[in-house]
Amino acid sequence: MNINAAPQIIGHGSQGVTPGYMSGFGNSFETEALPGALPIGRNSPQRAAYGLYAEQLSGSPFTAPRGANERSWLYRIRPSVKHSGRFTKADMGLWRSAPCLEYDMPIAQLRWDAPSMPQEDLTFLQGVRTMTTAGDVNTQAGMATHMYLITQSMVDQHFYNADGELMFVPQQGSLRLVTEFGVISIEPAEIAVIPRGVKFRVELVDGPARGYLCENYGGAFTLPERGPIGANCLANSRDFLTPVAAYEDRDVPTELFVKWGGALWQTTLPHSPIDVVAWHGNYAPYKYDLRTFSPVGAIGFDHPDPSIFTVLTSPSETAGTANIDFVIFPERWMVAENTFRPPWYHMNIMSEFMGLICGVYDAKPQGFVPGGASLHNMMLPHGPDREAFDHASNGELKPVKLTGTMAFMFETRYPQRVTEYAATAGTLQDDYADCWRGLEKRFDPSRP
């Protein structure tokens, strides 16, 4: 199949509601780009069809419980051992990994404006700017948050991350992620997740692109438990899309970059590694449209905890304490009676990195801009600014629909340490704390 053509659903078992994708979360998928490329009833035939090589990609130990066991079988033109060659260290640029102690910054609530799009040519790897790190990449715990600024597609360059899975959150411009498993296209208000070890390249679709990137060192993202919410709402499994098989058979010099142990390595290949003709399994990249998230909330009074907006969670070994929660604040109705409707003032055991894809965030109508970010680390107080407080305290409590907005949060159990880049960036707002300065003493013991 020509990788430059739109991927199609071809062959045995490739069922999906959208051309090019298969619907579902964590399914055991199967797809082939050439008829008969996928063996039936076995994984490793003596001679695979079309002269392909059978290769397993494992995302969990062999003995992981069945519900947590992740692997896929790939039928490819060349095995990955043919891809490795000799690796040499490459320049990491502004990409950092935990633990990153390069800058000792005083604790504070922090907020950044959106970075400007650079004029120079920057591919994905050159355009990553790490904002915070948490945990330890070598113990497979924690995360890193990054911004990406891309002005040039990767050409004859590919990458995979052995340290963690990557979640792309576009804010400006669309991306085409050409992966071993197939092609994923995403735009602002969509996300994509690329598991550890999956080779891919990043291409621009409609000009320069800016967005956020979460690097998850810990357990793979999964859907949160709904508890008493029941069987529906929040992020529904059917809205997650995994690409059908698409491959290229190109014998051209290609650079392969690997992030491993917090460092970047590279080698040169004589061919493209995007050569998987068929695959089956439950370890694969996927995309999700955040606009399909079905929010739930208070329909009587009070403001519920933000955990009800969790799209995906990376669990830790402690039940209910996430390695990462990915939370969004989408369009929704505000109807609670006799209630302060914005998020309340808070001190939290978790550390919160927030971004804004579009619109206005209801707790911060000023200063928190699309493409910007904020960091509220563990046990540092935060909450609505003066303007939001006054409006919510005195406004008419009629039903109001928040429209045209999409904020998100990467929340982790670990403290998030700020990188030197983030601490010295010209986009760092030195007056962020002033947004609370106008909150005056209102206490009057004579007026209950």
UniProtKB/Swiss-Prot annotation:
| Pfam families assigned | HgmA_C, HgmA_N
Query: What are the catalytic residues?
Result: 303 (proton acceptor)
Q: Which residues bind homogentisate?
A: 361, 382
Give a yes or no for keyword Metal-binding in this entry: yes
Provide the top EC class: oxidoreductase
- Tell me which UniProt keywords the record has, alphabetically: Dioxygenase, Iron, Metal-binding, Oxidoreductase, Phenylalanine catabolism, Tyrosine catabolism
Pathway of action? Amino-acid degradation; L-phenylalanine degradation; acetoacetate and fumarate from L-phenylalanine: step 4/6
Q: Name one GO cellular component term.
A: cytoplasm
| UniProt entry tagged with the keyword Metal-binding | yes
Q: Which cofactor does it need?
A: Fe cation
BP terms from Gene Ontology: L-phenylalanine catabolic process; tyrosine catabolic process
Q: Which GO terms describe its molecular function?
A: homogentisate 1,2-dioxygenase activity; iron ion binding
Q: Which positions bind Fe cation?
A: 346, 352, 382
Q: Which reaction does it catalyse?
A: homogentisate + O2 = 4-maleylacetoacetate + H(+)
Q: What is its EC number?
A: 1.13.11.5
By its UniProt entry, which InterPro entries does this protein fall under? HgmA_C (IPR046451), HgmA_N (IPR046452), Homogentis_dOase (IPR005708), Homogentis_dOase_bac (IPR022950), RmlC-like_jellyroll (IPR014710), RmlC_Cupin_sf (IPR011051)
Q: Which family does it belong to?
A: Belongs to the homogentisate dioxygenase family.
Q: What does this protein do?
A: Involved in the catabolism of homogentisate (2,5-dihydroxyphenylacetate or 2,5-OH-PhAc), a central intermediate in the degradation of phenylalanine and tyrosine. Catalyzes the oxidative ring cleavage of the aromatic ring of homogentisate to yield maleylacetoacetate.
Subunit comment for this entry? Hexamer; dimer of trimers.
UniProt name for this protein: Homogentisate 1,2-dioxygenase
* Organism the protein comes from: Rhodopseudomonas palustris (strain HaA2)
Gene that encodes it: hmgA
